[in-house]
Amino acid sequence: MGKVLAAALIGIAAALAAERLLAFRNRLNATREVDPVALPNCRLIKGIEAGSEDIDILPNGLAFISSGLKYPGLKSLAPDKPGEIFLMDLNEKKPKASELRISRGFDLGSFNPHGISTYIDKDDTVYLFVVNHPHQKSTVELFKFMEEDNSLLHLKTIRHDLLTSVNDVVAVGPDSFYATNDHYFYDFILMFLEMYLGLTWSNVVYYSPKEVKEVAAGFYSANGINISPDKKYIYIADIFDHNVHVMEKHADWNLTHVKTLQLDTLADNLSVDPDTGDIWTGCHPNGMKLFYNDPDNPPASEVLRIQNILAEQPTVTRVYAENGSVLQGTSVATVYNRKLLIGTVYHRALYCEL
């Protein structure tokens, strides 16, 4: 009897493990291959060799680019080099990327930048919020952009018990923001188990010096986050659920769910065109390839443009896609004056004229 029971339990465990593996592969789009969509006027951005995970463009055409992310389980092309923030002026005829100098006193050696967001105050001061992972922790670094000498003045480091595994932020004030925690755990083994078991423990947190609180939960992996031009809605990409959530923002900073747009790809960071309200997102057609790191079968790239997301039937257009021969692991796409920047988790960056 005992042997029969043991065999039954082993069989049940094996069946559950197989079901979880299948679900995990589906969340990663493990069998998808991308059909190419080419853009004619593109070039790789010189100087960006180790990632361009997130990009934020000011209304005047200055683009901030985070580079050098080291993320658990993912490849890094410069594992021993600190992260950097680059600047590009998209008004120039041939824009170039230049590294921004960061003020003394900031720990550059452990700088590991992830998502970024800018905020322009009433006096035109530009603040740059940078998700940082020093020593496998999560902080948000607040900088002031010093345009006269193209540098960043570090103002403060933000830590909080609710900011556990921060992926991205969207600034809503000079010292306040919404942040996505892409996992409950940050340790890679526990993070993998969380993904494998399909736990929906990821969330969104609102932070200000006076109040910190969870404002949305129940995501497989809340990733990119941004805000509508009218500041009424917050957009959240759940990368492993293949969708974008629209949340209404209230006066008390709480969020309520409005709708979910389902996609057939893994949407990473979200950028919003301030003129049209269109959402642009860098996507991973097949997330499994990000983790396998096979040089003969690299992760592909994909860029989507989402128009009229509040409509009953939003328009989703594949603007760019390729098999990884040019760009590997696209994480962001953003536009300014018919110029498109496409960034990656750990690879190069692309500049295109539309």
From Swiss-Prot:
Protein name according to UniProt: Serum paraoxonase/arylesterase 2
Subcellular location: Membrane
Cofactor note: Binds 2 calcium ions per subunit.
Catalytic residues as annotated in Swiss-Prot or TrEMBL: H114
Glycosylation, residue list: N29, N254, N269, N323
Species for this entry: Meleagris gallopavo
Matching InterPro entries: 6-blade_b-propeller_TolB-like, Arylesterase, Paraoxonase2, Serum_paraoxonase/arylesterase
UniProt: Ca(2+) 1 binding residues: E53, N167, N223, D268, N269
Disulfide bonds: C42-C352
Reactions mediated catalytically: a phenyl acetate + H2O = a phenol + acetate + H(+); An aryl dialkyl phosphate + H2O = dialkyl phosphate + an aryl alcohol
GO process annotations (BP): response to toxic substance
Membrane-related topology note: Peripheral membrane protein
Family: Belongs to the paraoxonase family.
Alphabetized Gene3D superfamilies for the sequence: TolB, C-terminal domain
Binding site for Ca(2+) 2: D54, I116, D168
PTMs per UniProt: Glycosylated. The signal sequence is not cleaved.
Keyword Calcium: yes
Cofactor names: Ca(2+)
Keyword Repressor assigned: no
Task performed by this protein: The absence of paraoxonase activity in turkey and chicken blood and in turkey liver indicates that PON2, if expressed, does not hydrolyze paraoxon.
The EC number(s) this enzyme carries: 3.1.1.2, 3.1.8.1
Keyword set, alphabetical order: Calcium, Disulfide bond, Glycoprotein, Hydrolase, Membrane, Metal-binding, Signal
Superkingdom in the source lineage: Eukaryota
